Amino acid sequence: MKVYLAAPMRGDRSALANVKKLLQALEERGYVVLTKHVADDVLDVEKGMTPREVFERDIRLLEEADVLVAEVSYPSLGVGFEIAYFLLRGKPVIALALRERLESVSAMIRGITWENFRLVAYSDVDEAIEKLDSMLPGSVDMQ
């Protein structure tokens, strides 16, 4: 199964350590993570990619992915776009937010009631991984 892991890139990257652990956990479980770059310390644009190249690559990866896992504890226009893009294609989205940041997550995201969307609060990354284990497509909770 191909996972699009989404996380803030240009804004507040306070959850980066959690994103790195999520990436590692997904790969250890045999998932193909298409967006390993979200866990990089150096941004793609700092490596020379143009915004257009980033957009085109990410759209291609969104189309290829089976499920989107988004870290939404800190605001990101890009992650919001990716979530909407995926949802409108009827694909499953799991949004993860640190419990202490849940009220800071966009009301638009917190208000999604579509069947292919789950917002999951977590206290630490181990809890997030445990919840992901039960929620990824194929499990009872996302069907």
Curated annotation (Swiss-Prot):
| InterPro entries per the UniProt record, alphabetical | 2'-dNMP_N-hydrolase, DNPH1, Nucleoside_deoxyribTrfase
Xref: SUPFAM superfamilies: N-(deoxy)ribosyltransferase-like
What is the catalytic activity of this protein? a pyrimidine 2'-deoxyribonucleoside 5'-phosphate + H2O = a pyrimidine nucleobase + 2-deoxy-D-ribose 5-phosphate; a purine 2'-deoxyribonucleoside 5'-phosphate + H2O = a purine nucleobase + 2-deoxy-D-ribose 5-phosphate
Q: What class of enzyme is it?
A: hydrolase
Question: One GO biological process from the UniProt record?
Answer: deoxyribonucleoside monophosphate catabolic process
Look up the EC number in the record and give it: 3.2.2.-
Indicate which residues the UniProt annotation says bind substrate. H37, E82, S106, A107, M108
Q: Tell me, in a sentence or two, what this protein's role is.
A: Catalyzes the cleavage of the N-glycosidic bond of deoxyribonucleoside 5'-monophosphates to yield deoxyribose 5-phosphate and a purine or pyrimidine base.
Q: Which family does it belong to?
A: Belongs to the 2'-deoxynucleoside 5'-phosphate N-hydrolase 1 family.
- Enumerate the HAMAP family for this protein: Nuc_phosphate_hydrolase (MF_03036)
Would you tell me the protein name for this molecule? Putative 2'-deoxynucleoside 5'-phosphate N-hydrolase 1
Provide the species name.
Answer: Thermofilum pendens (strain DSM 2475 / Hrk 5)
